């Protein structure tokens, strides 16, 4: 079983959904966790309360990952509260499916700023504190492989995350830092529900073509993240790990 005892992790966008599940499972495996949120303070505090009630250690920190100062603040929280940093999970993400004719500069920049620039800025801020054995996990998406219609901007961001993961694995590998992407299929989260994906024809089609015959749950992604964060995955870097129930 993967153990993270003595490790310190930062999880961005961790007030709900996949991020909350990852933060909770990292803590359950023994890590001290910084739970980042951009606006949902109540959600982040709920995650921390659950972690501490189970005997774990966690704190919240507010920050917009697409802002350099905020990215630095997020990382500083780990050092201030726990004295070091071993694991970075770049989970913050926004999405809006939009057909080409409706794409605007605002739609483009909002998604690329959070999903791509945010991944770079948080990792950049973390780098001075990461040493041999550290793990960076970028949360991508199956969309970069299946390229659904009306998702050119969102899919573009996740394709960029895939590419950045490969580049950083080469760049940071000599320092002993592993970098991987964890790419979920459709997962039942608050965001997926509010976007109308859960229960939609698109979701039903996706599940019917998934070899394991079901959609994903946040815990499915969180368990994979714990493994990638652990020393059990010490020889894995530069990989795109598809957590999709076999869908591709």
Give short role names for the model-derived ranges.
Residues 8, 15-16:
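Conserved glycine-rich cofactor-binding loop
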Residues 99-100, 104-112, 206:
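Substrate-binding pocket helix/loop in short-chain dehydrogenase/reductase
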Residues 123, 157:
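Active-site helix of classical SDR
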Residues 128, 170-174, 234:
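Alpha-helical segment proximal to the catalytic Tyr-Lys
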Residues 141:
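Residue(s) in the substrate-gating loop at a strand-loop-helix junction
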Residues 146, 226, 237-248:
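Short C-terminal tail/terminal secondary-structure segment
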Residues 174, 186-210, 220:
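A glycine/serine/threonine-rich, flexible loop-to-helix segment
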